Amino acid sequence: MGSRKCGSCLSSLLIPLALWSIIVNILLYFPNGQASYASSNKLTNYVWYFEGICFSGIMMLVVAAVLLVLENDNNYKCCQSENCSKKYMTVLSMIFSALGIAFSGYCLVISALGLLQGPYCRTLDGWEYAFEGTAGRFLTDSREWIQCLEPAHVVEWNIILFSILIALSGLQVIVCLIRVVIQLSKSLCGTYSVIIQPGII
């Protein structure tokens, strides 16, 4: 019962993380609060991978919903025996937790690549990835950020939002990993009740 409540709490935690991922990813389309750059395709290419909207967002909401349904006591009726049903639900829970790791892991990797690449911005040489060859060194040297003339404050915008996406998807990976460990321990160890009969001791 305790592990089931813990699993439900972890599944519920995925919902706000997914919603925030969607919001943060959407904000990446509006650097400096302007929509003109998205309509003219002047955004970093990693924004178009929909890592926060689709994978760490909508897909994780689906995963969370399925996991919450699987944690419901009323679902242990798919087989003829309760023990069979519990094993079946445990396997399904592990599969969807693994899918959650894959979806959030995708967002984590793409967001990290977007952070290291830097924004697509207008410099003195025109529109380009001004920091693409710096291997992320620009992240710790704010003096280089002045190379981006437009959109205004796009470097800070990208760094903050991609960092938040990395944190959110990282938390999702951790939550799903914990769920896998819980389900593995349940399936390998099982839950046994010890009945001591009078007169044996």
Swiss-Prot record:
Name of protein: Transmembrane 4 L6 family member 18
GO CC aspect terms: membrane
Membrane topology: Multi-pass membrane protein
Membrane-side (Extracellular) residue stretches: 31-49, 115-157
Annotated disulfide bonds: none
Subcellular location: Membrane
Coiled-coil portions: none
InterPro entries tied to this protein: L6_membrane
Any Pfam family: L6_membrane
Cytoplasmic topological domain residue ranges: 1-9, 71-93, 179-201
Family: Belongs to the L6 tetraspanin family.
Ranges that cross the membrane: 10-30, 50-70, 94-114, 158-178
Domain of life of the native organism: Eukaryota
Keyword Protease: no
Keywords: Membrane, Transmembrane, Transmembrane helix
